[in-house]
Amino acid sequence: MLCTAPLVSSAASAVLLAFAIPNEFWLAGSSVLGLGALVPLYVGFLLSPAKKHVACSYGLFVALVHACSSFWLKNFQGFALFTLGASTVGYFFYALPFGVAFACILRKQAPARACAFALVWTLWEWVKSTGILAYPWGTVPMTAHSLSHLIQIADITGVWGLSFLIPLANACVAESLHFFIKKRDSVPVFRLWLLTGCLYCLCSLYGAYRIATLGAPRTTLALAIVQQNADPWDTXSFEKNLTTAIHLTETALRTQTAPPLPTTPYRKEKTLTHASARAPVDMVVWSESSLRYPYEQYRHVYNALPAARPFSAFLRTLGAPLLVGTPLRLSGNSTKGGYANAVALLRPDGHVAQVYGKMQMVPFAEFIPWGHMTSVQRLAQMLAGFSESWTPGPGPRLFHVPCAAGGSVRFATPICYEDAFPSLCAALHTQGSELLINLTNDSWSKTASAEWQHYVVSLFRAIELRTTLVRSTNSGYTVVIGPEGKTRAAFPLFQATSAVLHVPVYPVVRTYYARMRDWVIVLCALIFFAEGVRMAVHTRRHSTTQAESSLQQIRGEHV
């Protein structure tokens, strides 16, 4: 029988973390709650009698956090059993080895034990956010976006520095509770608080310095950004959605006024300056999948629809290129599903100037892991009603657009949840990009928390790379994020709206994270491996010593 105490504490921590992450009750989440959400879990680990209890309680914790914070996955085209159910069960088993690792570190004393807890937690969040099953949601940095000074360390450590610091703070609180319960020596707990306090102070001071020395943008890019608030997957509304996007674009170009900053974000930010009347626009930006059918193969459709104002005719009147989401047929690909989820830069004459195909796709939604296996295809068809998926794009692409303010601007276009992946965005940015423009379709989620969670996950990319991030979505959260992670302008959620914004473009900076990428993870893995070897050697020596002692005792008895 499994001990119920660690399971109850795991469930309590899961609920607390789900509330600390942006949710339907507190749209911004709670950074304070995030600094204490893991305390019940940690105390439960300390009170657990066996490794299997710790492992199972951690698996339960991960599964519950996923189910509670990403419950909106159930709305993905009616595939709730597949997208939410299968992933929740999968994460339970995926987390079990890390539960065993947590059980092993409980043998240490307070300061070392707490640091080891934070180290293993960091490795877990990296594993969860990497590879074929990558899904970087439900992580502790999602609770910290309001700590504007602390999160600036992301340009050195990436988001992984926060994956270490936040569990460390939780461990401090938990160790203090454990001290009062067990009446142990207070010196180790004091040392732990001193270490954690120093780390937080140093990181906050660094953050204050980085914000104060941000510098001025080298130019601005006038973007007409359109939020259609329409579901692009609804093929019956294809013509209506296209008409809406065209109308919103023309409204933005005609009025050229910027929206007020929504009151939802709690920080007081400066709204971007808007373009003056009839000022030239450098580029029009629509959202992911705005062109439901592949543009190149369906030009005849876009020449005829919408009937009142065909898309091709509208394009010729723009006077600026259009950045838009559309499926892309991958040339030379003869396999099933040879289409990529793509972003295309269309010139007013209808020519495709540049295109980028999405490389990182949502597991169990945009692609089926191990989908090349016939048995997996049959299972997916039976459970979800589909067995084919998108094909990854050929690789990073750098876009160029002329700027009315002078020269041109280079930018990269991570698609949808690609802006949640630090290494991928760094690979796109280090080609020479001065700006990240993300095109997203989150309308299917039908929840405000899903929109805000995506925004929170993505804002760390702006800090890591010290670049402006523009998120153009079809329902929210459409937002411009500065290199310090602050909101410069935003549209209200689930409203059809548009505006022309002057987006600041900063000089290209190669941050330490951009150069070294996930060095924190490498360091954590080396420490974890070295400590594992040390513990194994120590255990073997201890067993050998015990065996020799027992043998000598037996010999002595015979004598």
UniProtKB/Swiss-Prot annotation:
Keywords, in A-Z order: Acyltransferase, Cell inner membrane, Cell membrane, Membrane, Transferase, Transmembrane, Transmembrane helix
Top EC group: transferase
GO cellular component terms listed in the entry, alphabetical order: plasma membrane
EC number: 2.3.1.269
Recorded topology in the membrane: Multi-pass membrane protein
InterPro entries: Apolipo_AcylTrfase, C-N_Hydrolase, C-N_Hydrolase_sf, LNT_N
Coiled coil region boundaries: none
Biological process (GO), any one: lipoprotein biosynthetic process
TM annotation in the entry: 27-47, 53-73, 86-106, 114-134, 153-173, 187-207, 519-539
GO function term, MF aspect, one: N-acyltransferase activity
Subcellular location(s) of the protein: Cell inner membrane
Active-site residues per Swiss-Prot or TrEMBL entry: E288 (proton acceptor), K358, C416 (nucleophile)
Annotated ranges, domain CN hydrolase: 221-507
Metabolic or biological pathway: Protein modification; lipoprotein biosynthesis (N-acyl transfer)
Entries under Pfam families matching the protein: CN_hydrolase (PF00795), LNT_N (PF20154)
Function of the protein: Catalyzes the phospholipid dependent N-acylation of the N-terminal cysteine of apolipoprotein, the last step in lipoprotein maturation.
Membership in a protein family: Belongs to the CN hydrolase family. Apolipoprotein N-acyltransferase subfamily.
Name under which the protein is recorded: Apolipoprotein N-acyltransferase 2
Source organism of this protein record: Treponema pallidum (strain Nichols)
